[in-house]
Amino acid sequence: MPEIGAHVSAAGGPQRAPERGGEIGCDCMQLFTRNQRSWKVKPIAPGEADAFRRARAEHGIGAVMSHASYLINLAATDPEKHAKSQTALEAELERCHQLGIELLNFHPGAHLEAGIEAGIETIAATLNAICRNHPDKTDVCLVLENVAGQGSTVGADFAELAAILERLETPERFGVCVDTAHAFAAGYELHTAAGWDAMWAAFDDHIGLNRLVALHLNDSRPPCGSRKDRHALIGRGEIGPEAFRRAVTDPRTASLPQMLETPAGPEGWAQEIDWLRGCAQGNQPDLPEIEDRNINL
């Protein structure tokens, strides 16, 4: 039985997030520990970390994953932007360490005009530098997320994530989160039973299923192979419901924390969590009727 949850708001401080997760039935959750669209970072206030840990225990939240800022580009070719990106991810790592958050999810980056090989080399070198700078933070798993393949982003193909991992000095500090909408946009045909199996076979061949630490559960508005990142409500997009039934029952994924980033909003996430939990229990519940609130994560 997987832990099932969603990306919840940390408005008012990260210690507020577990209560919000508990209110919608989360077993696990994802959050931003900082303003994800600003380079400026407020320090963790005195008592905030202890309050977060207490709230997490009180509301029965299992796995917690922080999503790093969207501004970070570890493949940036501009020296100033690259330095800011490395500093920002190091700050995210420090915050997770302080709060006791065990998973730090991030997008690898975009190579711009440098080319995919140069992008992979830069990303890996930056991650190696971060780990050397923070040898005491092995309690936080650095989680590479696959991307949809828009523009010059790195990591749409599992082989690209594998190439980054192969260049790491401390690969044991890293894991991978697969976003279903991103994988679909990148061309993995997970909407069919055969395509679902083929996707995980490819993942195992390139990366190894032992490195899979979480799933982002999102349906997709655009069709397979679109290279466009636009999430849809569970079962209401181009992927359809069967892939999500598989996600919560397939032995390869059923033990993982699985987190929603759909445009449903908190009330809708509660219904999607109930539906997924019913599927995980072997039932065949009807898809809930949910308003698309255009929440973008």
Curated annotation (Swiss-Prot):
Keyword Calcium on entry: no
Cofactor: Zn(2+)
Residues involved in Zn(2+) 2 binding: E145, D179, H216, E261
HAMAP family in UniProt: Nfo (MF_00152)
Binding residue positions for Zn(2+) 3: H182, D229, H231
Free-text cofactor note: Binds 3 Zn(2+) ions.
Reaction equations catalysed: Endonucleolytic cleavage to 5'-phosphooligonucleotide end-products
Protein name: Probable endonuclease 4
Gene designation: nfo
Annotated EC: 3.1.21.2
GO molecular function, one term: DNA binding
InterPro entries membership: AP_endonuc_2, AP_endonuc_F2_Zn_BS, Xyl_isomerase-like_sf, Xyl_isomerase-like_TIM-brl
Homology family: Belongs to the AP endonuclease 2 family.
Domain of life, source organism: Bacteria
Gene3D superfamilies: Divalent-metal-dependent TIM barrel enzymes (3.20.20.150)
Keywords: DNA damage, DNA repair, Endonuclease, Hydrolase, Metal-binding, Nuclease, Zinc
Gene Ontology process terms (BP): base-excision repair
Pfam families according to UniProt: AP_endonuc_2
Enzyme kind, highest EC tier: hydrolase
Described purpose of this protein according to its UniProt entry: Endonuclease IV plays a role in DNA repair. It cleaves phosphodiester bonds at apurinic or apyrimidinic (AP) sites, generating a 3'-hydroxyl group and a 5'-terminal sugar phosphate.
Positions of Zn(2+) 1 binding: H67, H107, E145
Region described as Disordered: spans on this chain: 1-21
Taxonomic source organism: Halorhodospira halophila (strain DSM 244 / SL1)
Taxonomic path: Bacteria, Pseudomonadati, Pseudomonadota, Gammaproteobacteria, Chromatiales
